[in-house]
Regions:
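Acyl-donor-binding surface of acyltransferase catalytic domains
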Residues: 1-27
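A conserved beta-strand-loop-helix scaffold within acyl/acetyltransferase catalytic domains
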Residues: 47-110
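Conserved acetyl-CoA-binding loop-helix of GNAT-fold acetyltransferases
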Residues: 107-112, 116-131
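Active-site-proximal loop/turn and secondary-structure-junction residues that shape catalytic pockets
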Residues: 109, 146-148
Length: 149
């Protein structure tokens, strides 16, 4: 839920240690990586959670920011319901400015009709599991703001 009445502040969280964890999903849900054609569903999800107001702008952002790097598509995770509809997303974003190897848990979102079921937690755990398997994968950052409570 987005609440723009709350003052905006940049909040950056840092994780220095990732523990092994079991990923638990509610019955009927699964997690998968990006597949060609997911752009429209991601755009609809971003509009449903209030992060975007235009499906076209959201889709363009996804294509330009995330599909421009072919290696990133295996790091884009979606929670899907029993019908295969995308109801959540998270990106295990790895950025390497000046050889620093920054890892970011990025664009975590769950459709309002599917919230409070543990899907966001499962998506975050999926990204963290990927980071944990990688060499030099720490720390992991999460940038957020009070609006997204």
């Amino acid at each position: 839920m987005i609440d723009r009445t709350i003052p905006f502040y940049n909040i950056i969280m840092r994780c220095d240690r990732i523990l092994p964890m079991e990923i638990k999903l509610p019955e009927g849900y699964s997690i998968r990586t990006y597949q060609p054609g997911d752009e429209d569903a991601w755009a609809a999800l971003m509009c449903a959670v209030g992060e975007q107001t235009s499906l076209i702008d959201a889709k363009n952002e996804f294509v330009q920011r995330y599909l421009a790097d072919a290696a990133l598509t295996d790091r884009i995770f979606f929670a899907v319901d029993s019908n295969g509809a995308i109801v959540g997303s998270a990106i295990a974003w790895a950025h390497d400015p000046r050889g620093m190897g920054v890892r970011v848990l990025h664009w975590v979102a769950v459709h309002p009709e599917h919230q409070r079921k543990g899907l966001g937690k499962a998506l975050c755990q999926t990204c963290l599991r990927l980071f944990r398997r990688e060499d030099n994968a720490l720390p992991v950052y999460l940038h957020t703001q009070p609006w997204s409570w």
